[in-house]
Amino acid sequence: MKTTKLLIPTQKEAPNDAKIISHQLMIRAGLISKLALGLYSYLPIGIRVLQKVENIIRQEMNKSGAQEVLMPIVQPAELWKESGRWNKYGAELLRFIDRHQREFCLGPTHEEVITHLARQYLRSYKQLPMNFYQIQTKFRDEIRPRFGVIRMREFIMKDAYSFHIDEASLQETYEVMYKTYCNIFNRLGLNYRIVLADSGSIGGNTSHEFHVLADSGEDTICFSDKSDYAANIEKVTFFKQEKTCQSTMVESKVLTKEKTSIEDVSKFLNVKKVNCVKILIIKIKDGFKALALRGDHELNEIKIHNLFGDFEFSTNNEIKNLGLKKGFIGIKNLDIDLIVDYSASVLCDFVCGANECDYHLIGVNWQGIKFIDADLRNAVDGDYSPDGKGKLMIKRGIEVGHIFQLGTKYSSVMKANVIGESGKAVTTTMGCYGIGVTRIIAAFIEQNHDDKGIIFSQAIAPFQIVIVPINYNKSTRVKALADRLYQQFIKASIDVLLDDRKEHVGIMFADSELLGIPHRIVISDTHADNGSVEYKARNKTNKIEVKFDDALSFIQTKMI
């Protein structure tokens, strides 16, 4: 490809709404163009990268034995009502009515459609297991699209769905897909972690997420510094601890006028937040509950949902009607059940509210207090790993893949049955496996860039090498050598870009670096005199003189 035949709308500055580096560089390098909030067009350079990502995914999925299909993005409401998700999914599901007054939606995912296909065509246990995948557009009406292609409304996803006669078969395919995802992300050159995860609105039991480590990530992940343990922060489980402290203080009440936050109270009383207990009041189906946590810990809402089902934080009026004072709630004289986090239940001589406006208690202990202890909190950096090996490190991550063991969540309600070996109908067991295709590019850039631009790997770079001929349109010798080398690369199946523009060499260099092309060859009249070319790798600073006749073989060694 020659640059004069290619749209490369590079920019010196990124738009003001581009807050993270991947968004800035994808705009500046001309990979994408914003159409509306959460909607982006992929330009020719971006398409080249996108297709290479898709090809790697497709190759590994095919190698795993999965079969490619393509399902409509427009889905009839009947399927979603049948699964029970039509009303549960929320505002992210874009619903519409066609000219015949029939209800449809734009698919944010395809569990219903694939289950419908399975019940049409899978009849016998002899056909199982069967794994289908597609690379298809999705639409989720995100309330707050941001970070460029990381959180879009319309995006491309690889989603796969497997069908099995039993849990044992599902486990086998799940392990195959786990390894397949590792192969994909390894080939893409991503620094990632695999974590235990919550299944969210998709449903199911066992679930793993694949996170690319990046400071701009929206997710918080935890992993041990001494073992392979890793989990989404919402999934880290803690266990009951042995109490090791002994009380040495006499409980007393102190004036803490207008000090309603743990931060303010700990500073005012000159105690660490770890020695404070905070109380949260929640409303559940059958009443109210008081939740007690250590002052330096945060509530894990998923754990609370798992304990009590749907819940809400109580309003100021509800707290007042319970006879409590917001900001001064304590553990004593409560008329509602008290649930105490494991880490708070082993404290001695702690600070908590006095259930009286402008007062707190110090030197408080649990003796005589009726409560139930449970795991209520999120992990923090330095916590002991749940597997007993090492301590937890907490990092930000961008989720690029998620695999689920769905079980019979969809197949049972949609009657995706097969005839089993006994001759009786058996409900199929399902797995679900997703990769955010468009998100991968941004995640890669977050990990691979410098002040000059993107640093693509050979696997997904728009071009493997760029030839920059100085005075290409003035020097016949330079043009002849550049054209000759260009043809050699093409014949060797090397993805090459020849910069044949009438531009200053500085602009040509800047564009090639911004685009992240891994290898660069420079040819000038001086090089023509010497029978050589200049080579530079995008991720290196040094330049190498290479004999012109050796240039092809030299580059081929770099491609290995």
Curated annotation (Swiss-Prot):
An example GO CC term for this entry is:
cytosol
**Gene giving rise to this polypeptide:** proS
> Where is it chiefly localized?
cytoplasm
- Note the InterPro entries from the entry: aa-tRNA-synt_IIb, aa-tRNA-synth_II, aa-tRNA-synth_II/BPL/LPL, Anticodon-bd, Anticodon-bd_dom_sf, Pro-tRNA-ligase_IIa, Pro-tRNA-synth_IIa_bac-type, Pro-tRNA-Synthase_IIa_type1
Organism, scientific name: Vesicomyosocius okutanii subsp. Calyptogena okutanii (strain HA)
Establish whether keyword ATP-binding is in the entry: yes
Alphabetical list of SUPFAM superfamilies matching this protein: Class II aaRS ABD-related, Class II aaRS and biotin synthetases, YbaK/ProRS associated domain
Q: Which UniProt keywords apply?
A: Aminoacyl-tRNA synthetase, ATP-binding, Cytoplasm, Ligase, Nucleotide-binding, Protein biosynthesis
What is the stated purpose of this protein?
A: Catalyzes the attachment of proline to tRNA(Pro) in a two-step reaction: proline is first activated by ATP to form Pro-AMP and then transferred to the acceptor end of tRNA(Pro). As ProRS can inadvertently accommodate and process non-cognate amino acids such as alanine and cysteine, to avoid such errors it has two additional distinct editing activities against alanine. One activity is designated as 'pretransfer' editing and involves the tRNA(Pro)-independent hydrolysis of activated Ala-AMP.
GO terms, biological process: prolyl-tRNA aminoacylation
| Localization per record | Cytoplasm
Query: Which reaction(s) are listed as its catalytic activity?
Result: tRNA(Pro) + L-proline + ATP = L-prolyl-tRNA(Pro) + AMP + diphosphate
**UniProt-recorded name of the protein:** Proline--tRNA ligase
What class does this enzyme belong to in the EC scheme? Answer: ligase
Q: How is the quaternary structure described?
A: Homodimer.
What EC number(s) is this enzyme filed under?
Answer: 6.1.1.15
What terms describe the molecular function in GO for this protein? aminoacyl-tRNA deacylase activity; ATP binding; proline-tRNA ligase activity
Q: Which family does it belong to?
A: Belongs to the class-II aminoacyl-tRNA synthetase family. ProS type 1 subfamily.
The domain-related comment in the record is: Consists of three domains: the N-terminal catalytic domain, the editing domain and the C-terminal anticodon-binding domain.
Q: Which Pfam families match?
A: HGTP_anticodon, tRNA-synt_2b, tRNA_edit
Q: Does the keyword Cell wall biogenesis/degradation apply?
A: no
Q: Which PANTHER family match?
A: MITOCHONDRIAL RIBOSOME PROTEIN L39/PROLYL-TRNA LIGASE FAMILY MEMBER, PROLINE--TRNA LIGASE
Task: Identify the domain of life.
Answer: Bacteria
